[in-house]
Amino acid sequence: MKYSAPWLFLALISLTPLLLKPESCAQNGERYRDLATPQVQSDKVAGPQGLGDYLVEGKLRLSLRDAVILTLENNSSVRIQQAQVESSKFALLGAHAPFDPLLTSLFNVSSSISPPFSTLQGTGGLNINVKSTTKVLQFNYSQTFETGTNVQAGLSSNNNSINNSFFLFNPYISSTMNFQFTQPLLRNGWFFPNRAPLVIARRNVEQSRATFSAEVSNSILEAVGRYWAVVEARGSLDVAKRSLDAAEATYKRDKRALELGALPPLDIYRSESQVASRRVQVIQSEYALKQAEDTLRLTLGADQDPYFQALDLELTEQPDPSGELRSIDTATALQQALAKRPEFEAVRKALSADDTRIRLSHNHLLPELDLTGAYASNGLGGTGLINGQQTSTSSLNQIFGFSYPTYTAQLSLSLPLKNRAARAELGTALVGRRSDLYTERQLREQVTVDVSNAVHQLEQAKLSIAAGKEALDLAKKNTAAEQRKYELGQGTIFLVLEAQTEQAAAEQSLLQAQVGYQLAVAGVDHATGESLAPYQLKVEELTR
């Protein structure tokens, strides 16, 4: 029974890692092998993905949803923002570092020769040097747990050989096995202050995900805008071509009338100048379309591959909205925005991290009060002559027999008289929380304005479509009337050409109103945090 106390102490020490392991283990997805994906480790950037799925008859045939999906898959800006999420995950992995176990070992050999200065050195004479050789072998293990408990265990052995005849054992081996734990009781003691960096790091990951969601929403809005810009540019080109065709038809009739003598020679220049002017508009519209398509290719990632960059785009969406036009009031839209905008989630996570930092700073103001307990088992072994008999002992048998124990208990107190570093840390945390509170208020103000503007733009677009359709109908009737009067000799070519110009302007205005409505719908979705909903997409699929 004389070994019961040491064995109990060792049992408790050995059980400590098992008792604390569930708390100190990383959560799923917080391990390096989970985070270091092949994409992260690759030193090359993958080419555009998924473009081949939309290749039809030598063209890229794209719906609006297709364009959004390709943007999220291939757009460089989206991938750069996604990298911020990955970076925050590795920062979380680094927050586990204080709890990593450490195993160290040491092997050292030293030999010395020195002249004797005393007969007690046992060399047998003044002309015989003192020769000694020491070999040291050590193994140490240490680990800190989320309770703040630091556990250390070590095993060391020293092999000493010296030409001293007074030594009982020569060579002799001294071995020690030691166990020690240190538990902070105030500052950095127990779970909260040690888990706080992990909590903050996890909040930062969640905040980066919310920020990425906001960037995805912005990228979707940009992709939608560029998609409809191509549709509008293509529609504008069609309007310009129809206007040119009408002017050329009028010019041909006037030229025929001039040949027959039914038109004064000077009147032909008006219709001829209109043909030239409208041809300029067609050229301008063609190059505006090219620029819009190049911008859309950049958004889709098609510019990254020369083959796909050279393909024509075939956009399947029509600007004229089908079905009932969307309606939403400002109050409902604002309520949705406050609940679903990812920017608010990012601010909430930042404020949560601020609260944790403040609590941690208060803990750092406490004095250091540490409880330390240690146990060591010593052993001495070697070969020597005792009472004229050859004797051999084992130091390892002695240390594991626990015959020569050493017990240590210590309570240490460190009381800073000012502790300015901790006070500065607390002040910084308080200022950070105040800054984030103002950020939340500023965000709420900006979102309120964004929602109001988006709803107003939607209502304006709906009214513009109705007015544009009426204006186009009247412009067509006016063109037909002026053309009929001119054919009957009651009108002038000036009025006919002016009516054609007004009709083209009405067509252009209606097209702009229709595209404006589509953009306004996308703007409402963006303002209310619903940008992903129309396309059945989730941000989690991009940040796994």
Where are these regions (language model features)?
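Regulatory alphaC helix of protein kinase catalytic domains
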Residues: K44-L70
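Acidic, low-complexity, intrinsically disordered peripheral segments
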Residues: S4, L19-R33, I113, D294-L311, ...
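Periplasmic alpha-helical coiled-coil/stalk elements that build and connect Gram-negative outer-membrane
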Residues: A95, R209-A333, Q457, E502-Q503, ...
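Small/polar, glycine/serine/threonine/aspartate-rich low-complexity segments that form flexible
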Residues: L55-K59, F107-F179, Q183, L315-R326, ...
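Amphipathic alpha-helical coiled-coil scaffold segments and their short linker/junction regions
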Residues: L263, D267-I268, A302-G373, S377-N378, ...
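Amphipathic alpha-helical coiled-coil segments
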Residues: I80-A95, E215-A240, A249, R256, ...
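Bacterial N-terminal signal peptides
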Residues: F9-L18
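A glycine-/polar-enriched beta->alpha junction
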Residues: L70-R79, E86-P101, Q138-P171, Q180-P197, ...
